[in-house]
């Protein structure tokens, strides 16, 4: 396709039915037919592959090298010799390797066999390989060295990575191994569940960013809100953030965080420790030729004088390093035999600008550049960088995060060995470093299982880390790769989250769609609601680099283009342009020269003839401006960068651009927009800014934007086809559409991604007409005959696990066995169950039916487990699962897969592909449906009021295109932006309809199904692709008359699963009060809830002091008030004290007994009232706090 070729050249897609069928019957034996699918998942797979392959033996080996050695001594200091250390032992890991998943089935010394992912899914286990570490220990600096390979437990392995058996398999072989023909990988299988590490947005690596943050001022008395922050990344992808703070007295402080603690160091201390530079050299390095800038020179003078004043004793580099070493010895856990000077060097290596390794001169140059940038920010010469802009962001890939955690766990492992030996030394136990047996004894006491910690991370998404890994969150790293349908599945791999820290922020600035993200993040595909703008998806052409480009020859190229090397130039003024390569200052040149260098490099890299200049090199030239971004030429070739292809006009070839450089480039969207001497690039297609899902919305350029956002969400909730190999999966719940079709109207990308292998809906004849009145409020009417012929007929598969071993302890003998015993049991059970006690495949089960039988040795009795769901089902499949740790144990664990039929019901949710969702309100008999002159009856009727306010014109266009496509037997291309104001879709598809003998506008005269008369208006009717969503009334309806209640409050429990009730909340109560329906209110809130009858005393008004008396022979139980009654003995005393003639005679009927033999008199003035039980509960709770409730009782 040449640059000027119009985009609308070919508007007819192909159905490719036979080609697809042939590919389905015999999958390709070489490579996949859909390379785009693999590209979509590449960032995940590529980042995991980088752990074990690449420079230095992969990231895990680089990480092990970076950890270095842990040192321990076997000597104990005494009073005579306080510095005695003894023999020195240095522990290190020299090699890390990961095997492919294997299993010996619990039989020791047996040959291992390959384990494939389908088995892990089916058996609900974890797909994992062994993590092997080569542990080295040397005594007294190499006097004797030993090494041993340690098995650190099984580590979960990513599918389709280089450690997976499926790697490089052809579609044919994948099918043979019970996978989809295009198994993408990119996820892990943990306990049978597919888990995915989601991508996160982090700050761009190795680039100093000027920030104004009010929280900076809270760090201390004279701190200001100005700072320069750099996130430095080591070769093993772990990062360390360094920040420079500006203080109001002109000082600058260097801040870093180590093991979740923050430390602040004066920046001059760091500069003096890096090189033996004099004050004059530091002054020149920061000010350069800009000596007239009094703002800068005054502050620098304060900075240097302040250092002299505060640390007069530090005169040279050695003293500074010793001072730093002394202060940070404990923090860095340095070994006792290291001098302070060496600890100071270790501090610089581990914390200060770690991406520059041990190059202290480069670090010093970079630090001076950062100080200069900080002063420019304070002076207002440059603006702060926006951390929310894609320009200053990169992606934290799942594989790299996984590697970081493994590295940290290896370091903890070494630390634990060291602590164990130290504990032995302190206890005075015999310690011999040269004895291999002693070391073996130590190692057996250490928990070596690193794999289980990674499995915990994947299954919960929680990060347990000592250092925090320089990240802002501790949870939410993993998600389940749900296979509701294929759209949902593929979206997981293109999803990128801003971080859970930002979800709690009250401000909306982080959620805004910024123009910098053009072509990298999709503007449409983000959820509505709380994660809006935080959870984004990549544009479908956006790639993420998982390898480091070879940039070793670039400095030489730059010098040949007129850049002066950094070593020769001390000046750092704004008159010069700083040239940086991956965070290292290469040299300086003038701003005019900088632009020429950038343009020349771009021409050369696209031309591809210059050796050592990779195509994906990012060339970000920031021109000098007044109060704009800090100028310079920044080159990037590292990992984790977002990249996308555009066409480079001077050479008419593909160029790869990144978000940093794109801001300062002129890229035309369409060839028509190109202006000479302005635009250097043009987009391959305007749809490159959209994600995969947003591209599949037909004619999305005709819709109002929120509707396209809704469709991106609803496409993922569709009851579609999650995959073809459903019989080899045991998901808790799977949705499947039985009658899926290929859409007549589809975007070109639909075929490129092979979406026809996973149909997601049905082509329906849709009439837009207000008919029957059942279509109000977005409801839709379905033709009863269409429903009977299978319109949107779906199935739900549910899996139930039955484990007999749960009731017995570990190591106990098996007491429960599947099958029938010799005791008596109902013979009807055999109608549903086989002789082995397992259900018959294909049998129909209802609530209460037996699903398996087992014999219990302890009770000598046959028992059954029953089907609990109220929805009838068919037994689809029974899987017998063996024990992982013991191959020969008898069967204890099975899974049963149920097939539940789901015919569209009234109340089920449907939607078109334009965010037009609605529920089915009626299934209308065919005889009563309106029909057209050609005898066509609509499958679906929707109300015309659904369109005006929502402005989904794309649905009208789809209806036209679908009708024309159905009449001519062609597929229609619905790619956005193929039409224009002059060339409209109404004309294009209208002509097709005319040729087929239909109305140009898509309207047709229709006849009433009830009377047979022609309707007065012509009806808009056409073919629209409809999706059935997973929100079905059968999963949602909740109804109960009586059922379980809460034991404390006696009110109905909540939750549909537990047969709970529906809560009448405050709003509902207010509505009932507002309507004056007091009887309804009493019925709902009392009689139907926690109605109870309680005795209350009329005199003291208490419900807690009443109790029933012990009945006498021939008399009824009476309710008495314990508080108002007096004891029988007291009553007798009162009588004997009264000497008057009319002394009271106690009547027998007044005397009553409580349950403990105590006699009382009186307290009989009680009555029974109806109250909510929760009132009784409240009363007793208040009584516990010493508060008495008194009720006024009507004497009647």
Swiss-Prot record:
This is DNA-directed RNA polymerase I subunit RPA2. InterPro entries: DNA-dir_RNA_pol_su2, DNA-dir_RNAP_su2_dom, DNA-dir_RNAP_su2_hyb_sf, RNA_pol_bsu_CS, RNA_pol_bsu_protrusion, RNA_pol_Rpb2_2, RNA_pol_Rpb2_2_sf, RNA_pol_Rpb2_3. It comes from Eremothecium gossypii (strain ATCC 10895 / CBS 109.51 / FGSC 9923 / NRRL Y-1056) (Yeast). CDD domains: RNA_pol_B_RPB2. GO terms for biological process: termination of RNA polymerase I transcription; transcription elongation by RNA polymerase I; transcription initiation at RNA polymerase I promoter. A zinc finger (C4-type) spans 1097-1124. DNA-dependent RNA polymerase catalyzes the transcription of DNA into RNA using the four ribonucleoside triphosphates as substrates. Second largest core component of RNA polymerase I which synthesizes ribosomal RNA precursors. Proposed to contribute to the polymerase catalytic activity and forms the polymerase active center together with the largest subunit. Pol I is composed of mobile elements and RPA2 is part of the core element with the central large cleft and probably a clamp element that moves to open and close the cleft. The lineage of its organism: Eukaryota, Fungi, Dikarya, Ascomycota, Saccharomycotina. It catalyses: RNA(n) + a ribonucleoside 5'-triphosphate = RNA(n+1) + diphosphate. Component of the RNA polymerase I (Pol I) complex consisting of 14 subunits.
């Amino acid at each position: 396709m040449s640059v000027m070729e119009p985009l609308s050249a070919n508007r007819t897609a192909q159905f490719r039915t036979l080609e697809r069928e042939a590919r389905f019957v015999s999958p390709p034996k070489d490579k996949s037919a859909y390379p785009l699918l693999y590209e979509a998942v590449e960032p995940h797979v590529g980042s995991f592959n980088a752990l074990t392959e690449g420079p230095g033996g992969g990231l895990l080996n680089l990480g092990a090298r970076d950890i270095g050695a842990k040192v321990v001594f076997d000597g104990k200091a005494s009073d005579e010799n306080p510095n005695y250390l003894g023999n020195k032992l240095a522990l290190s890991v020299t090699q890390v390797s990961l095997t492919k998943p294997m299993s010996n089935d619990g039989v020791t010394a047996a040959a291992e066999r390959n384990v494939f992912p389908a088995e892990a899914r089916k058996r609900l286990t974890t797909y994992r390989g062994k993590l092997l570490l080569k542990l080295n220990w040397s005594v007294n600096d190499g006097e004797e060295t030993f090494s041993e390979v340690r098995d650190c437990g099984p580590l979960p392995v990513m599918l389709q990575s280089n450690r997976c058996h499926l790697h490089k398999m052809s579609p044919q072989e994948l099918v043979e191994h019970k996978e989809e023909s295009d198994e993408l990988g990119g996820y892990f299988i943990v306990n049978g569940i597919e888990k995915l590490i989601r991508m996160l947005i982090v700050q761009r690596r190795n680039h100093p960013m000027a920030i104004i943050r009010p929280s900076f001022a809270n760090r201390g008395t004279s701190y200001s809100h100005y700072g320069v922050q750099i996130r430095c990344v080591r070769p093993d992808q772990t990062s360390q953030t360094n920040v420079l703070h500006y203080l109001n007295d002109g000082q600058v402080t260097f801040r870093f965080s180590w093991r979740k603690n923050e430390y602040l160091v004066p920046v001059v201390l760091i500069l003096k420790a890096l090189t033996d530079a004099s004050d004059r050299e530091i002054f020149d390095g920061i000010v350069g030729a800009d000596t007239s800038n009094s703002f800068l020179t005054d502050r620098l003078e304060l900075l240097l004088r302040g250092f002299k004043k505060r640390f007069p004793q530090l005169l040279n580099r050695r003293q500074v390093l010793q001072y730093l070493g002394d202060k940070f010895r404990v923090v860095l856990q340095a070994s006792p035999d290291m001098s302070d000077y060496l600890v100071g060097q270790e501090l610089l290596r581990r914390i200060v600008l770690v991406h520059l390794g041990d190059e202290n001169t480069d670090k010093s140059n970079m630090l001076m550049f950062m100080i200069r940038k900080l002063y420019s920010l304070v002076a207002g010469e440059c603006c702060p960088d926006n951390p929310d802009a894609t320009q200053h962001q990169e992606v934290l890939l799942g594989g790299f995060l996984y590697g970081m955690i493994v590295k940290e766990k290896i370091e903890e492992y070494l630390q634990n060995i060291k602590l164990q030996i130290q504990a032995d030394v302190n206890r005075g136990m015999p310690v011999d470093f040269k004895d291999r047996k002693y070391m073996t004894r130590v190692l057996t006491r250490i928990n070596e299982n690193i794999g289980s910690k990674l499995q915990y991370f994947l299954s919960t998404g929680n990060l347990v880390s000592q250092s925090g890994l320089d990240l802002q969150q501790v949870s939410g790293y993993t998600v389940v790769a749900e296979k509701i349908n294929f759209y949902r599945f593929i979206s997981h791999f293109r999803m990128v989250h801003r971080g859970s820290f930002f979800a709690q922020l009250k401000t909306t600035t982080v959620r805004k769609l910024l123009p910098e993200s053009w072509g990298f993040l999709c503007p449409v595909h983000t959820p509505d609601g709380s994660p809006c703008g935080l959870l984004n998806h990549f544009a479908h052409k956006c790639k993420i680099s998982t390898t480091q480009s070879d940039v070793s020859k670039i400095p030489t190229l730059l010098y040949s283009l007129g850049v002066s090397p950094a070593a020769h130039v001390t000046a750092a003024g704004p008159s010069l342009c700083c040239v940086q390569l991956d965070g290292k200052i290469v040299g300086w040149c003038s701003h005019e020269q900088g632009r020429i260098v950038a343009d020349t490099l771009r021409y050369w890299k696209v031309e591809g003839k210059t050796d050592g200049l990779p195509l994906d090199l990012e060339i970000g030239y920031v021109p000098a401006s007044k109060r704009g971004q800090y100028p310079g030429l920044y080159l990037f070739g590292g990992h984790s960068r977002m990249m996308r292809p555009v066409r480079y006009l001077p050479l008419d070839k593909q160029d790869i651009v990144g978000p940093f450089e794109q801001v300062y480039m002129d890229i035309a969207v369409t060839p028509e927009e190109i202006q000479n001497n302005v635009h250097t690039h043009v987009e391959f297609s305007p749809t490159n800014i959209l994600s995969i899902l947003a591209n599949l919305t037909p004619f999305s350029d005709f819709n109002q934007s929120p509707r396209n956002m809704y469709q991106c969400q609803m496409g993922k909730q569709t009851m579609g086809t999650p995959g073809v190999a459903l019989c080899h999966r045991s998901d808790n719940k799977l949705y499947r559409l039985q009658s899926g079709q290929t859409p007549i109207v589809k975007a070109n990308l639909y075929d490129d991604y092979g979406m026809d292998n996973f149909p997601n809906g049905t082509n329906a004849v849709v009439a837009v007409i207000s008919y029957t009145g059942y279509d109000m409020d977005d409801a839709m009417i379905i033709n009863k005959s269409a429903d009977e012929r299978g319109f949107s007929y779906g199935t739900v598969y549910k899996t139930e696990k039955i484990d007999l071993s749960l009731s017995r302890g570990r190591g106990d003998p098996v007491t429960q066995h599947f099958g029938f015993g010799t005791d008596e049991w109902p013979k009807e059970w055999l109608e549903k169950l086989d002789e082995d006690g397992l259900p018959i495949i294909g049998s129909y089960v209802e609530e209460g039916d037996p699903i398996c039988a087992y014999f219990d040795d302890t009770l000598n009795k046959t028992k059954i487990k029953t089907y609990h769901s109220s929805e009838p089902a068919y037994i689809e499949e029974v899987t017998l699962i063996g024990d992982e740790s013991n191959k020969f144990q008898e069967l204890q664990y099975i899974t049963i897969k149920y097939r539940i039929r789901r015919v569209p019901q009234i109340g089920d949710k449907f939607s078109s592909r334009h965010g037009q969702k609605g529920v089915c309100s009626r299934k209308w008999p065919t005889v009563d449906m309106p029909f057209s002159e050609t005898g066509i009856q609509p499958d679906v009727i929707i109300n015309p009021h659904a369109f005006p306010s929502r402005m989904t014109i794309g649905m009208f266009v789809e209806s036209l295109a679908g009708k024309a496509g159905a009449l001519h037997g062609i597929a229609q291309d619905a790619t956005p932006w193929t039409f224009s104001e002059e060339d409209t879709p109404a004309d294009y598809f209208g002509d097709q309809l005319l040729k087929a003998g239909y109305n140009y506008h898509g309207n047709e005269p229709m006849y009433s199904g009830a009377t047979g008369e022609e309707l007065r208006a012509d009806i808009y009717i056409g073919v629209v692709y409809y999706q059935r969503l997973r929100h079905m009334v059968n999963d949602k309806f909740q109804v109960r008359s009586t059922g379980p209640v809460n034991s404390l409050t006696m009110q109905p429990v909540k939750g549909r699963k537990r047969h709970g009730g529906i809560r009448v909340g405050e709003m509902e109560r207010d509505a009932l009060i507002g309507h004056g329906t007091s009887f309804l209110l009493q019925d709902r809130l009392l009689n139907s809830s926690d109605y109870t009858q309680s005795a209350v005393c009329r005199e003291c008004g208490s419900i807690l002091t009443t109790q029933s008396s012990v009945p006498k022979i021939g008399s009824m139980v009476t309710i008495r008030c314990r508080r108002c009654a007096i004891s029988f003995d007291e009553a007798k005393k009162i009588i004997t004290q009264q000497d008057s003639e009319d002394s009271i005679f106690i009547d027998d009927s007044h005397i009553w007994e409580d349950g403990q033999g105590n006699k009382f008199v009186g307290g009989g003035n009680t009555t029974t009232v109806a109250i909510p039980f929760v009132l009784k509960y409240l009363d007793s709770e208040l009584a516990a706090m010493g508060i008495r409730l008194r009720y006024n009782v009507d004497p009647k």
